Design a protein with these regions (language model features):
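Transmembrane helix-boundary motif of multi-pass solute transporters/channels
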Residues: 17-53, 64, 70-88
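Membrane-embedded alpha-helical modules
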Residues: 91-194, 298-390
Length: 390
């Protein structure tokens, strides 16, 4: 059966959008899950967070694509979730973390609405921001090898699958590793006699009343805002521009900021412009340039469909051998770690400030109940101003 050129023009962007959603979710949900659990979420609250975020940016992707006719795709903040892992529990527990998520959303919306604030964020030196991110990512990226020592029979196949897939089909490396991890979880559960909690397979939105504490605002909201802007929104906009599209910056950033504030009480930490998966819907594989907005719309619909899997992935994580989910999360972030290290140490002149920022962020120490990322940023800026004046 033959297809008309018109059919092909529709099929190509629709398929690209579906791939965008599938890769976007499967390649990073483990990081988000680890981040939410690290700051105090129960399994049900973590599932609610995954569901709220996926529904939230799914709806916003469709709206932005239809209004602007540009292949804008959104995502959760994967580096932001890594930040949550490195921060851990804060004073006030999960409700305080949720309060920090609300503040993060409002700050992002304010940055999008006020050009001067956006310019201020953009002035944070690249090497300092990248060094802070690299320090945040380091412990997560070490996790696969720690897990390998603890459970080699389960973790080794995951790492091998990731390496082989990285050689053959890099885009699918993490989904393939995840598939192998699911197989390992099933084998482990059958040996131990554990079974999935069927009641938790259907995800539900769970409301958490936010509380606000200064340690959570300073230790989570401020670094999360900076990481999300510097590592997601700015690179995401750059990807779209690289394909010749005009970026609807204000509407994208304001809507994702307000969207974050809305989904935060349900466990969502931050949503933003997609960076890692942005090229899937904006590139040539998504069809003729004037139809690539359809790929974004398709991605939004895909995310709405995939959102229903939030309960399943959390239930699987609950019966997983220790370390296997963290191993998948770490493998998913290795590329981001390498890129951030390259950005941090690209210029010899700034390596001292970048190095100290990286080491402090990687240390994970908490001062005055505020996590390492905030202090690493301050230290890096202070050292840069002191040692590297023009």
């Amino acid at each position: 059966m033959s297809h008309s050129p018109t059919d092909a023009h529709w099929q190509q962007p629709v398929t690209a959008g579906a791939v965008t959603a599938l890769v976007g979710f499967t390649s990073s949900f483990a990081v988000v899950l680890a981040g939410l659990r690290a700051v105090g979420a129960t399994p049900a609250q973590a599932a609610s967070g995954l569901l709220a975020l996926t529904l939230g940016f799914g709806v916003l992707i469709i709206a932005l694509a239809l209004v602007h006719r540009v292949p804008v795709t959104l995502a959760w903040s994967t580096p932001g979730a890594a930040l949550l892992v490195s921060t851990g529990s804060v004073e006030g527990g999960w409700p305080a973390a949720v309060g920090a998520f609300v503040v993060t959303g409002l700050l992002i919306a304010l940055i999008g609405a006020v050009p001067a604030l956006g310019a201020l964020v953009a002035r944070i030196p690249t090497e300092i921001a990248q060094a802070m991110l690299a320090g945040i990512l380091l412990q997560l990226c070490i996790a696969p090898f720690v897990a390998l020592a603890d459970a080699p029979g389960y973790v080794a196949p995951v790492i091998v699958a990731w390496v082989v897939a990285s050689r053959i089909a890099p885009r699918w490396a993490v989904p393939v590793a995840l598939l192998v991890a699911v197989g390992a979880i099933v084998v482990a559960a059958s040996r131990s006699g554990e079974s999935l909690d069927t009641a938790s397979l259907v995800p539900r939105l769970e409301w958490t009343t936010p509380t606000w504490t200064w340690p959570a605002i300073v230790g989570i909201a401020l670094p999360l805002t900076i990481v999300t802007m510097a590592s997601q929104n700015l690179p995401g906009a750059a990807v779209l521009r690289s394909f010749g599209f005009s970026v609807p910056w204000r509407s994208s950033v304001v809507s994702t900021g307000l969207g974050t504030a809305v989904v935060a009480p349900f466990g969502g930490h931050a949503m933003n412009l997609a960076a890692l998966s942005a090229a899937l819907a904006a590139g040539e594989e998504a069809g003729p340039r004037e139809r690539r907005w359809i790929a974004a719309t398709s991605a939004g619909v895909g995310y709405l469909v995939i959102a229903g899997a939030a309960g399943l992935v959390v239930a699987l994580a609950d019966v997983a051998p220790p370390g296997i989910i963290e191993a998948v999360a770490g493998l998913a972030l290795i590329g981001a770690l390498v890129a951030s290290l390259q950005g941090a140490f690209a210029h010899e002149r700034h390596r001292t400030s970048a190095g100290l920022t990286f080491l402090f962020a990687a240390s994970g120490v908490s001062l005055l109940s505020v996590g390492a990322a905030f202090w690493a940023l301050l230290l890096g800026l202070a050292v840069r101003a002191t040692l590297e004046r023009d």
